Amino acid sequence: MPAVKVKENEPFDVALRRFKRSCEKAGVLAEVRSREFYEKPTAERKRKAAAAVKRHAKKVQREQRRSVRLY
């Protein structure tokens, strides 16, 4: 859990912004969202495999776009 020490004479909204940023960097909200409902191990593997296929296709497409230039 991220912790933020409030500096002297620091406005509350600035400290809150720093806390939100540290939570986002630590991935707290993403973790909470992923654990909100139970996901069967097979469903999790299937989702991760689909994400890997999508990432690979995106990478291949990016590489093809780069190599098309013939000038």
From Swiss-Prot:
Biased composition (Basic residues): 49-59
Positions of the UniProt region annotated as Disordered: 49-71
Name the UniProt record assigns to this protein: Small ribosomal subunit protein bS21
GO MF terms, alphabetically ordered: structural constituent of ribosome
Entry-linked PANTHER family: MITOCHONDRIAL 28S RIBOSOMAL PROTEIN S21, SMALL RIBOSOMAL SUBUNIT PROTEIN BS21
Ranges of Basic and acidic residues composition bias in the record: 60-71
Keywords: Ribonucleoprotein, Ribosomal protein
Protein family per UniProt: Belongs to the bacterial ribosomal protein bS21 family.
One Gene Ontology cellular component: ribosome
Annotated Pfam families: Ribosomal_S21
